[in-house]
């Protein structure tokens, strides 16, 4: 795949370590981007990161929306402080909460709209919109689960509505792709978040997305872990860091090679004795092609793509540091 990019020292697709980049800051075009103080700013920074990453790689990328939850709470806390400072005891708690909720929803709607419109209007250096997937996983163990649920619901609501084309007609945007995770609490069996799944189904019926992933099946197949594919459909294999912790975000796919199984079946003439040797031959070619990709990346310096290697999308290597330790 993507043989025209073979000579460029960059990989195919990845899971951006967006949580680290938002929490600890990043650098884009030589300018320091500090950790956001509000949801709206976090959404803007996230789209800037997506565009920068897409301009420096040829494959898709995925971001986990759960990392925006804490910033929605920051906004709630900010509005609560502001209203308390302004009105104090003049307003009863119920009215105060109503004020905060109204203002928070305005920011939630605006932030999600920023993500959707920025991704669909920004052009990368490749001359195309960023190929990006938003991973919508409502994890009950997340301390910001209520905020994440609000964000996911609004993303689905806006995707259902669509984006206006030049004639002013609402159409289905190509990106971002949406992946919605089904778990025990939202699988339409009386769970707390079933209402969001109903919105997802309604959205899929009109806009084709979201796609769905079963958390139960993923845990069975991936050692109890639930995570997004990279861009469109490539899943990482489980891997633990030096501390024994599973790592998904901040990892990538060095290259992609496909096998045309129907072609092998046709060539073998439905003869199993011919089919298996042919398959072994093709698998050997696949391995050779993948190792060519691997060796082409060896020796690459972090300066080739600072947003990936130096400023958090994949790692935080030093300037001019080889990326080799991330390849093995």
Roles of regions detected by a PLM:
Residues 1-327:
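Conserved catalytic cores of very large enzyme subunits
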């Amino acid at each position: 795949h993507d043989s025209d990019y073979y000579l460029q020292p960059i990989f195919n697709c990845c899971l951006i370590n967006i949580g680290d980049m938002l929490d600890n800051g990043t650098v884009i075009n030589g300018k320091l981007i500090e950790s956001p103080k509000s949801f709206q700013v976090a959404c803007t920074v996230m789209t800037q990161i997506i565009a920068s990453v897409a301009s420096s790689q040829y494959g898709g990328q995925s971001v986990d929306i759960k990392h925006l939850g804490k910033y929605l709470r920051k906004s709630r806390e900010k509005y609560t402080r502001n209203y308390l400072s302004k009105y104090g005891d003049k307003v009863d708690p119920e009215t105060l909460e109503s004020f905060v909720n109204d203002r928070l929803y305005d920011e939630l709607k605006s932030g999600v709209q920023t993500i959707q419109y920025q991704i669909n209007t920004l052009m990368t250096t490749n001359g195309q919109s960023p190929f990006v997937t938003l991973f919508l996983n409502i994890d009950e163990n997340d301390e910001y689960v209520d905020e994440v649920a609000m964000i996911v619901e609004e993303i689905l609501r806006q995707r259902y509505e669509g984006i206006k084309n030049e004639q002013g007609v609402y159409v289905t945007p190509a990106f971002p792709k949406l992946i919605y995770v089904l778990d025990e609490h939202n699988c339409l069996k009386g769970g707390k978040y079933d209402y969001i799944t109903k919105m997802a189904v309604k959205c899929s019926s009109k806009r084709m997305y979201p796609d769905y992933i079963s958390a139960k099946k993923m845990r069975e197949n991936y050692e109890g872990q639930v995570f997004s594919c990279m861009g469109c459909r490539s899943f990482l294999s489980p891997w633990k860091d030096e501390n024994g912790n599973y790592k998904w975000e901040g990892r990538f796919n060095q290259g992609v090679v496909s096998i045309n199984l129907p072609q092998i079946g046709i060539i073998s003439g439905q003869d199993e004795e011919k089919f298996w040797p042919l398959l072994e031959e093709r698998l050997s070619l696949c391995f050779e092609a993948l190792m060519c990709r691997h060796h082409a990346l060896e020796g690459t310096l972090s300066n080739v793509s600072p947003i990936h290697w130096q400023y958090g999308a994949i790692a935080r290597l030093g300037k001019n540091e080889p990326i080799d330790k991330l390849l093995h």
